[in-house]
Regions:
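A short beta-strand micro-motif
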Residues: 6-8, 53
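Extracytoplasmic
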Residues: 13-85
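Long, low-complexity, acidic/serine-threonine-proline-glutamine-glycine-rich intrinsically disordered tracts
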Residues: 1-4, 30
Length: 85
């Protein structure tokens, strides 16, 4: 069971999510490899809608943290999030 994912960015439009993920992938291809992004729309009420770009598929918190640490060492901010079942 994949209980964790790594959030890379949170932006205002699906187009921006796609564009920014392409930039992140180009810079971090050796880390991200062929992992597919998952874009989640989140409505934050007064703050509006955001599109969060995540890399899913981590079975453990440790695996997600290790992946995020690699990204951070390469200059990419990220956040480990638990998948809501």
């Amino acid at each position: 069971v994949n209980n964790y994912m790594v959030q890379l960015i949170s932006v205002r439009t699906p187009a921006e999510a796609s564009k920014e993920f392409t930039k992140i992938l180009n810079k971090n291809n050796s880390i991200i490899g062929n992992r597919e992004p998952l874009v989640k729309e989140v409505d934050l009420g007064d703050r509006g809608k955001f599109y969060r770009v995540n890399i899913p598929g981590f079975a453990s918190l440790e695996a997600a943290n290790a992946f995020c640490s690699e990204l951070k060492e390469n200059g990419q901010d990220c956040l480990v999030v638990k998948v809501q079942q």
